[in-house]
Amino acid sequence: MIMKKILSWFLYITCILTLVACGKSAAPITLPQADEITSIDITIEENTVSHSDKTWISEVIADISSSEPTKKESIQDFPQVESYIKIDFRLETGTSTIFAYEDRGKCYLEQPYQGIYKIDRKLFERLKEIE
């Protein structure tokens, strides 16, 4: 009888741990290739700065590519925070937009309907620089 209880608890805990470990994993951020981007426009409130320097674009794309997926979902066109940075990747074929923001002391990128990604503060501060 005691062995049955121990075995039942073991199976129960194993099932729970398996379900938790196999939760939905977020996909990495989807970005255009650096050589396809003609410029990156960064908008903070009403101020927009356009960056067309290929070196700057490549560095920013590399930094953004290293962002870590979170389990948070993006279900809106815009982040649900008061203040955010809009990042428009201008391509010859159109525009791709992501957003950067700070929430509870952590910095994130949000790609509408794709995912939310954690970034380091250094990248966030770089994006905030309006020259």
For each feature predicted by the language model, list its residue ranges.
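Function-determining sites in protein domains
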Residues: 2, 22-131
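Sec-dependent bacterial lipoprotein signal peptides
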Residues: 1-24
